[in-house]
Amino acid sequence: MSDYSDLDRQIEQLKRCEIIKENEVKALCAKAREILVEEGNVQRVDSPVTVCGDIHGQFYDLKELFKVGGDVPEKNYLFMGDFVDRGYYSVETFLLLLALKVRYPDRITLIRGNHESRQITQVYGFYDECLRKYGSTAVWRYCTEIFDYLSLSAIIDGKIFCVHGGLSPSIQYLDQIRSIDRKQEVPHDGPMCDLLWSDPEDQTGWGVSPRGAGYLFGSDVVSQFNRTNDIDMICRAHQLVMEGFKWHFNETVLTVWSAPNYCYRCGNVAAILELNEYLHRDFVIFEAAPQESRGIPSKKPQADYFL
């Protein structure tokens, strides 16, 4: 796009937590689709890069993240999904990230989380929020269509595998991820579902997930996968960590959580992972944006769903 003035104006508007017009959302999603369709299921990302976990519509905390981590395009970012649901500002959060993607496609990578799904967003807030803010379901439809185009995973310098949830018993090789047809709603089971839903667990082999989707996977599964694919570690999100990040299995799996004071009541801190060009790791810990800097909606937009 030769003229970025409209897009830059929309980005500024979204940064003030103001929604853009429905027809602007439609056009933005059309442009985003053109970019995302070219990305692979295992999207290649070059260091240096800052890796982020779940955001969940906590817009003012996303602003805090950029405050401590630096802005796009000065910094290169990878977000590991779950942009929407549960927080008060899923619309502004997702549209800001999407607008940044369209404006600076090589400086921000967005991969899909289990909440980037039609079914899940109808239960956990994004659908209702779109309806409330736009008076129709059109914006929800445009956004959920884009969800289908998001990459399923990313690999940094060929060495750090990034995925929202975890591993799948159906996948031994990265090439098996590359051959998935991702342009669909998240299935209830199978490899695509597992990548977005699974969790590491102190055990050997595979276990039944209490989430009802995906699997629990043990340290032996990880060492086999990492060895087979010649990678150093797996970086993922998907689980609340009170300290913002958590190592598993002798530093072969890392959970990063980037939504501070999750659901505005969990009291956790958040983290982002800064990787330099040598893949040296630096964790930046941050707290929720101060109360006075955030507009809290006058009434709660949704019921207290279980965490």
Curated annotation (Swiss-Prot):
It is an enzyme of class 3 (hydrolase). It is found in: Cytoplasm; Nucleus; Cytoplasm, Cytoskeleton, Microtubule organizing center, Centrosome. Binds 2 manganese ions per subunit. Its EC number is 3.1.3.16. SUPFAM superfamilies: Metallo-dependent phosphatases (SSF56300). The keyword Nucleus applies. PANTHER family: SERINE/THREONINE-PROTEIN PHOSPHATASE PP2A-RELATED. GO terms for molecular function: metal ion binding; protein serine/threonine phosphatase activity. GO terms for cellular component: centrosome; chromosome, centromeric region; cytoplasm; nucleus; protein phosphatase 4 complex. Belongs to the PPP phosphatase family. PP-4 (PP-X) subfamily. The keyword Manganese applies. InterPro entries: Calcineurin-like_PHP_ApaH (IPR004843), Metallo-depent_PP-like (IPR029052), PPA2-like (IPR047129), Ser/Thr-sp_prot-phosphatase (IPR006186). Reversibly methyl esterified on Leu-307 by leucine carboxyl methyltransferase 1 (LCMT1) and protein phosphatase methylesterase 1 (PPME1). Carboxyl methylation influences the affinity of the catalytic subunit for the different regulatory subunits, thereby modulating the PP2A holoenzyme's substrate specificity, enzyme activity and cellular localization. Signal peptide: none annotated. Pfam families: Metallophos. Gene3D superfamilies: 3.60.21.10. Its main location: cytoplasm. Mn(2+) 2 binds at residues 82, 114, 164, 238. The modification Leucine methyl ester is found at residue 307. The active site is at 115 (proton donor). This is Serine/threonine-protein phosphatase 4 catalytic subunit. Protein phosphatase that regulates many processes such as microtubule organization at centrosomes. The probable PP4 complex Pp4-19C-PPP4R2r-flfl (PPP4C-PPP4R2-PPP4R3) is required to prevent caspase-induced cell death (in vitro). Its cofactor is Mn(2+). Coiled coil: none annotated. Mn(2+) 1 binds at residues 54, 56, 82.
